[in-house]
Structures are given as C-alpha cells and as structure tokens.
C-alpha cells in the first residue's frame, strides 16, 4: 500500500494566505473578546474600525503645554547615543555642522566705524570615530551668544572657543561671509558710488593650531594683450577699425593672516592690494568721460590670466601681514565660448593636487 506524505514544510502561497486570512477574520467577527485574547490579542486588529489597543491621539496643537525639566530629560537624544548606533564606518569626520545660517552682524571697519551686514555663517567641528553625532543647534545657540558684539577676529576666536567647549570637540571652524560696501570714486567725473565686495572671514582650529583667513572676490576688466596688438595691426597696416576683446573677470584671493590686533589687515587693505595689482576694477558710477577713461585704463593695462595671478601674487608677497595665500582667477572670455583660468598658491596651506570640479563656476559676479 502506498502512503502519500505531504510536504509539511511547504510555505503557503498568496491565495492560501488570503483564504486563511478571510477565515480568521470571519471567526474574529463572531468571537468574544476573551476568545480573541486567548488566541492572540493581535487578531483584534483584523476587525473593522479602530483597533482596540490603539490610543486616541489629540489633533489640536497644545498651546498651553510647557516643558518642565523632567519632560525634557525624557526626550530621546539620538545624536548622543552609543557608538552602536553609528551607521557606516566608525571613522573620524573632519567637519560636521551647519552652513548658511544668517543673521545681522556688526563689523569694525578701517574707514567708516562699525557697519551692520547680513552675514552667512558656517560652523563646524570634528567628530571622533566613536561618537554618533553632534547637537547642531548648539552651534547656532553658541554663536547667538556673541551675536550682539562688534565682530573682529578676536570675537570670532572667543566664539570658536565656546562652541569647541559646548560640543566637546577637538577641532572647529567658523566662516562668516558677507557683502562689504566701499565708496569708490569715478575715474574723471568726480562721482562716487558703493562697490560691494564678497568677503569671508575664517578661523580654523586643528590639532591645537589656530589660523585666521580672509577671502575676497575682486571683480575687474581684462583686456587681451594679443587682441589689442592685432587690433592695432589692422589699424596700422590696413586702416581698418578694430577693437580688442575684454571681459569681466573675477579673482578669488584667499590669504592667511599673520598679523595681530595692532597691525591687522582690514577689509579695505586687501581690496586696495588687489586694486594696486590690477587697477582695471569694474566701475560703479560712470559718465562719458569715465567710460573713455576706463577704455584708456584697459589699454594701458592689458592682461592675460597668467599675468593676473602673478600680479596679485607680487602685491600679496610684499605685505608682511600675509602668510600663505591662493589666487584663483577666471577671465570670462568675450571672444571664446570658454573661460581662461589660473590658480597660484604660495605656502602649503592652499596647495592641492585636486580642485573642486565646480570651483571656477563659482567665480561669477551676479550683481
């Protein structure tokens, strides 16, 4: 006699599961609460309507609710959790924090007392390999603790000390970015107007060494020396009117400051160093006589992008308040469909074998 033994380990398919679910739901609709509890309390969730063990939640915002110390202590704090919560490799993170939180900040200036400017702040700290994360709101709270002061590098350093302590980190960094106004005279008409310079101040504390940096975007006109000579050749040999091509150009000048409070490098000082290197800065207020003067100034100072980098370099080398530096220049060509670019560094601070793929795309003056 043959005896057939079914495969008891076979998993049910979807149709079999649906049939079993319908059977269980039909039984639950006629069973008592005690019977359901005896079988499995979760069966109650198969019944229509609200599950019996699901809480009724308030939907109105509790305006009168206040947080006391006990409630605050009960709140989960995942970022300060154990290292077992870390996802990915247990590796040190060099910078973690917040970027582009904005607030009005008052700054010292060389020529016009104190000015209040909208400032974008980036604050970050290092994170040890065994720590889950940081409480990022502490960076903002710490910064706001100093926000009413008139900022200088000394105030930035005190702020840095505070949030290194608050976040219990070894390394830290603050960068403050703003648009700084300076009144600029026209070339010949006697008019004046405000030129705005994108400036960033940065304090970095790594391995117990603290360093201060200033970054400036300087916008100027560059006339191509080759195009100038070719235009003159057409005029001289063929009597043909021709104009050289020139274009708006941007140099991002980053300098490490070695000076102290008594001999600081002011915002205005760095602008003037750049203007000394390349005098064809774009103009603010322009009448006809100023436009003619600007054409003459460009003709007297034709410049390739290589010349621009080296001209800035010479001006920066001559200032004892400046240590390492970097110049990134972009001539946004009116002749070509591409730009001409150059990068010059002095000292190890800014030296790099690799460049941010979008570095030169950030060198645009958008007005």
Swiss-Prot record:
It catalyses: GTP + H2O = 7,8-dihydroneopterin 3'-triphosphate + formate + H(+). Signal peptide: none annotated. Pathway: Cofactor biosynthesis; 7,8-dihydroneopterin triphosphate biosynthesis; 7,8-dihydroneopterin triphosphate from GTP: step 1/1. GO terms for biological process: tetrahydrofolate biosynthetic process. Keywords: Hydrolase. The record marks 224 as: May be catalytically important. It comes from the Bacteria. Its EC number is 3.5.4.16. InterPro entries: GTP_cyclohydrolase_FolE2 (IPR022838), GTP_cyclohydrolase_FolE2/MptA (IPR003801). One of its GO terms (molecular function) is GTP cyclohydrolase I activity. It is an enzyme of class 3 (hydrolase). Pfam families: GCHY-1. HAMAP family: GTP_cyclohydrol_B. Converts GTP to 7,8-dihydroneopterin triphosphate. Belongs to the GTP cyclohydrolase IV family. This is GTP cyclohydrolase FolE2. It comes from Dinoroseobacter shibae (strain DSM 16493 / NCIMB 14021 / DFL 12). The gene is folE2.
């Amino acid at each position: 006699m043959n005896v057939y033994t079914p495969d008891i380990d076979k998993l049910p398919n979807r149709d079999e599961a649906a049939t079993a679910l319908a059977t269980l739901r039909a039984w639950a609709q006629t069973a008592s609460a005690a019977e359901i509890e005896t079988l499995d309390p979760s069966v109650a969730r198969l019944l229509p309507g609200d599950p019996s063990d699901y809480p009724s939640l308030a939907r109105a915002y509790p305006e009168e609710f206040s947080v006391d110390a006990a409630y605050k202590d009960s709140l989960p704090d995942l970022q300060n959790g154990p290292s077992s919560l870390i996802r990915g490799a247990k590796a040190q993170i060099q910078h973690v924090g917040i970027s582009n939180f904005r607030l009005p900040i008052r700054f010292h200036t060389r020529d016009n007392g104190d000015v209040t400017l909208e400032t974008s702040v980036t604050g970050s700290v290092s994170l040890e390999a065994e720590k889950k994360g940081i409480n990022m709101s502490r960076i903002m709270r710490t910064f706001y603790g100093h926000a009413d002061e008139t900022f200088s590098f000394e105030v930035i350093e005190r702020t840095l000390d505070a949030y290194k302590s608050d976040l219990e980190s070894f390394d830290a960094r603050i960068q403050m970015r703003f648009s700084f106004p300076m009144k600029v005279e026209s070339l010949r008409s006697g008019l004046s107007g405000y030129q705005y310079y994108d400036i960033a101040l940065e304090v970095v504390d790594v391995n117990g060494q603290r360093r201060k940096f200033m970054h400036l975007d300087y916008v100027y006109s560059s006339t191509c020396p080759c195009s100038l000579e070719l235009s003159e050749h057409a005029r001289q040999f063929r009597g043909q009117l021709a104009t050289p091509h020139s274009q708006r150009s941007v140099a991002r000048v980053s300098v490490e400051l070695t000076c102290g409070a008594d001999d600081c490098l002011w915002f205005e000082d760095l602008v003037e160093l750049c203007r000394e290197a390349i005098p064809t800065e774009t103009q603010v207020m322009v009448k006809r006589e100023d436009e003619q003067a600007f054409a003459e100034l460009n003709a007297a100072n034709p410049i390739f992008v290589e010349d621009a980098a080296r001209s800035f370099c010479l001006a920066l080398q001559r200032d004892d308040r400046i240590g390492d530096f970097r110049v990134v220049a972009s001539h946004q060509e009116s002749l070509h469909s591409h730009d001409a670019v150059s990068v010059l560094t002095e000292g190890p601070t800014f030296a790099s074998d690799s460049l941010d793929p979008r570095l030169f795309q950030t060198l645009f003056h958008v007005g």
